[in-house]
């Protein structure tokens, strides 16, 4: 998974020392709202403005407001929902990465079978 590799690399290497876009062969695109660059190869990108910063010991947690979103063609269903089966999603639960996306059920399934 190239996206997983790039995510792990970007989380472990400082942008002060390395041009991560160049090193990983990623395409930077300048966002319309903030001017910050996002990664063209990602299926969904969001531009945010920082609203709060919380110091947590050796790290900081940033709370942002989404001001723009960019979604690649084919990611949304005709109804405008994210088509999870078209994405290879993962999450980080330190220190491990886990796959996301296998459909387990549909909202309301626990009560619909009781009728």
Description of each model-found segment:
Residues 1-115:
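Basic, polyanion-binding surface patches
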């Amino acid at each position: 998974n190239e996206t997983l590799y790039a995510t792990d690399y970007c989380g472990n290497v400082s942008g002060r020392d390395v041009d991560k876009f160049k090193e990983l062969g990623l395409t930077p695109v300048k966002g319309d709202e903030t001017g910050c660059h996002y990664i063209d190869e990602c299926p969904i990108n969001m531009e945010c403005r920082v609203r709060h910063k919380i110091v947590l010991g050796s790290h900081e947690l940033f709370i942002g407001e989404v001001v723009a979103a960019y979604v690649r063609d084919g990611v949304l269903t005709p109804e405008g929902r994210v088509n999870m089966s078209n994405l290879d999603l993962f999450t980080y639960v330190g220190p491990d990465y886990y796959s996301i996306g296998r459909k387990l059920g549909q909202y309301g399934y626990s009560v619909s079978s009781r009728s």
